[in-house]
Amino acid sequence: MRSVKRQMIRMVGAALLALASSAAAQPLQRGIETRIVAELNRARADPGAYAAELRRYRTLYRGRIVWTPGNPVGLRTQEGTAAVDEAIRFLAAQAALPPLTDTRLLARAAGDHAADQERSGLQGHGGRDGSSPAERIRRRGGGIYAGTGEVIAYGPTDAASVVRELIIDDGVPDRGHRRLMFSPRFRAAGAACRPHRGWRTVCVMDFSTSPDGR
């Protein structure tokens, strides 16, 4: 319990992803919240296969710009392929993990923070009311006897991009998002996405060490 709390504090202190580009805004993918948890479970179930996908994604880099299909202006990264290469090595050494239960309680807690940032245009894990991820989960009836965690991505409009960028964790020195998502301690997750006036979109994913978020 204490170690999970310490881990969460480290994750909260990690720098946030800067994933927006100057391309025209796109609508959020239909059903993106459940797709995010499913995509993360796919990566957890077979990290080696996901590493192979990242090797193919790596070929889209030109210096620090990623030129994905349909994006004529590219996506600027901080580290270029260095972060991708590190993620590939991490995944190659990572054992398969059981799936996270997609939990409504955690999705609601994530939705509270995403909606707050939609209104405020702010970033980070702290709510405008001073709430932490653990406090928001408790307000929804969870996290009382469990460890909790949270990751946030800004900019992507589809689940695959959200999960991929959090796993690569470009610009985050301690790779806190990646380590949290592959922690064997967590057993449940829930995601929520909303529009964000500064970064197009904000996607929040909350985690719990209990199977139902409680």
Language model: regions and residue ranges:
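Intrinsically disordered, low-complexity serine/threonine-rich segments
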Residues: 6, 24-25
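N-terminal signal peptide c-region/cleavage motif recognized by signal peptidases
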Residues: 20-22
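A well-ordered secondary-structure block
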Residues: 103-212
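Helix-centric, low-specificity signal for extended rod-like, repetitive segments
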Residues: 3, 37-38, 171
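Classical secretory targeting signals
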Residues: 16-17
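Bacterial N-terminal signal peptides that target proteins for export
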Residues: 2-12
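Short, well-ordered surface patches within globular domains
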Residues: 26-142, 178, 184
